[in-house]
Amino acid sequence: MCFDYIDIDQFVTPNPFLDSAVAKIARGGILAVTATDTSALSGTYPRACLRKYWAMPLRNELKHEIGIRILIRKVQLIAAHHRKAAIPLLSYADQHYMRVFFSVAKGKEKADTLLKQHQYFLYCDGCMGRKISEENGGGCSCGEKYTIAGPLWTGML
């Protein structure tokens, strides 16, 4: 039995429920995911984010967008394990939670296409320079070292 709509809306991380939800979502179904562990995703506890979401967050003015992009990547990795593609339709952060709605398509080729958009976000605290990179390091043209976030979803939100 597959479902057209599954909503994961619990307290803290959605991780314990992602595998089951992705396995049971129908082709073309909508998967809604809420994360209330914003302290991890927004960079207050970066080691917790690394353990839960396999990515490093940023703690600056971009923290909510970076957190959403990390959450999207985590869902896409779980979906790819099931040969499904989780395409973000709508995402937002409000107060103490982040929420993303996905359209789920079947097919390993579609999943592989999404996985190519998992990269690193590099941020320079010196000049506020930003760039997306497949590599997780390097220095900014102003001479400062980049602060690294990710890997994360770099596609459209």
Where are the predicted features?
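SAM-dependent transferase fold signal centered on methyltransferase-like domains
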Residues: M1-L157
